[in-house]
Amino acid sequence: MTAPALKPATTLLVIAKQPVPGRVKTRLVPPCTYEQAAALAEAALADTLQAVLLAPAARRVLVLDGEPGPWLPPGFDVMPQCGGPLDERLAAAFAAMSGPALLIGMDTPQVTPDLLAVDWQAADAVFGPAADGGFWALGLRVPDPALVRGVPMSTPATGAFQRARLLSAGLRVADLPQLRDVDTAADAVAVAAKAPQGRFAARARALAAVLSPVATGKGATGKGVIEASALRETA
């Protein structure tokens, strides 16, 4: 007799802002307008949510600053973010969980479902480092907000500090691959090239003439145009 398949135990959380012009991806302005930056943010969020939908999970939660929009697919519970600095908001999200939870942001649209499949028998925590020194994923088998609260955020040492916090608590840490956050025009071009089939890449291709010259530092003409052409060719 075949044993029944185990149900996924992980709650997958996405912490995000409503993609409103002037509130998201402001480091893309310039070269983008606020509206273009928000469109890139919405596409990144849509790709992220799609990856979460395709990953094994007991529950999927959007921890949202703002209001849901047409970019939110069915299958997610929506939990409002609390106020305060980022470490407090992350801590509050984990505090609301009763079992294993993996939290990611909206800045890595290249994430794939397989990266979000966690083997909790082999790990007490999951850590995904970001190229800028932060982290793109944090998972806890036993959610403990104290493991996040007080971690200095948005610094080049944030990721190292957070990982050291996990290790100092005696946790077995499973490391995920490093991913690049989308914060700048150069980030947008690089990430779009890594995941050319997604909505983020399509939006970046539409804005290639804006993004690529700045990303390469070549100006609007000359060699910078090569990058714009490369983005269009991946369509």
Spans of features found by a protein language model:
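Conserved donor-nucleotide/metal-binding helix-loop-beta segment in metal-dependent transferases, i.e.
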Residues: V111-G133
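Conserved alpha/beta core of the MobA/IspD/sugar-nucleotide pyrophosphorylase nucleotidyltransferase superfamily
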Residues: A164-K218, G222-A235
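Acidic donor-binding segment of Leloir-type glycosyltransferases
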Residues: A57-F76
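N-terminal nucleotide-binding beta1-loop-alpha1 segment
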Residues: M1-R27
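Short phosphate-binding loop-to-helix
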Residues: L72-L102, T155-T158
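A short, N-terminal amphipathic alpha-helix
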Residues: A39-A57
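Short, glycine-/small-residue-rich phosphate/pyrophosphate-handling segment
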Residues: R141-L166
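Short glycine-enriched loops at secondary-structure junctions
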Residues: I15-V20, D65-G66, A131-G133
